[in-house]
């Protein structure tokens, strides 16, 4: 099922992303730059290993993981987190934990688009990506 997420995805819409970053403690200047970028996400699968690369003029990140196995991650805003990604009901659920906090990044496919829902406490941001040819 994770195969359905494989591809190159370009951000086309973003809702409430600044509030989400603010809730994580991201500084004003970084939020301003990050809010203006339109990142490309590349999802690859090689055997049991999934790679998610996020590329933008702001910062490039890459994570490699296997479903259900916790791993260390350094986020785009330089948080050092413990991450766990699972597949549940056709959704990739990515949970990051650090310093007693937790945020969830849920990726799902809706009408051929990749919908990324970011949740931290009561703050929710939705980012919509379209697949590139």
UniProtKB/Swiss-Prot annotation:
The modification Phosphotyrosine is found at residue 20. Belongs to the calycin superfamily. Fatty-acid binding protein (FABP) family. This is Fatty acid-binding protein, heart. The lineage of its organism: Eukaryota, Metazoa, Chordata, Craniata, Vertebrata. (9Z)-octadecenoate binds at residues 127-129. It comes from Mus musculus. GO terms for biological process: brown fat cell differentiation; cholesterol homeostasis; fatty acid metabolic process; intracellular lipid transport; long-chain fatty acid transport; phospholipid homeostasis; positive regulation of long-chain fatty acid import into cell; positive regulation of phospholipid biosynthetic process. The keyword Acetylation applies. One of its GO terms (molecular function) is icosatetraenoic acid binding.
């Amino acid at each position: 099922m994770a195969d359905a997420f494989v591809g190159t995805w370009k951000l086309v819409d973003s809702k409430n992303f600044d509030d989400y970053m603010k809730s994580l403690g991201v500084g004003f200047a970084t939020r301003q730059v990050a809010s203006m970028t339109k990142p490309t996400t590349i999802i690859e699968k090689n055997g049991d290993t999934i790679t998610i690369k996020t590329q933008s003029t702001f910062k490039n990140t890459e994570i490699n993981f296997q479903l259900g196995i916790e791993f260390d991650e350094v986020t785009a805003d330089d948080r050092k987190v413990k991450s766990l990604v699972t597949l549940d009901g056709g959704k990739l659920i990515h949970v990051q934990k650090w310093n007693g906090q937790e945020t969830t990044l849920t990726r799902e496919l809706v009408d051929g688009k990749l919908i990324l829902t970011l949740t931290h406490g009561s703050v929710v941001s939705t980012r919509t990506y379209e697949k590139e040819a």
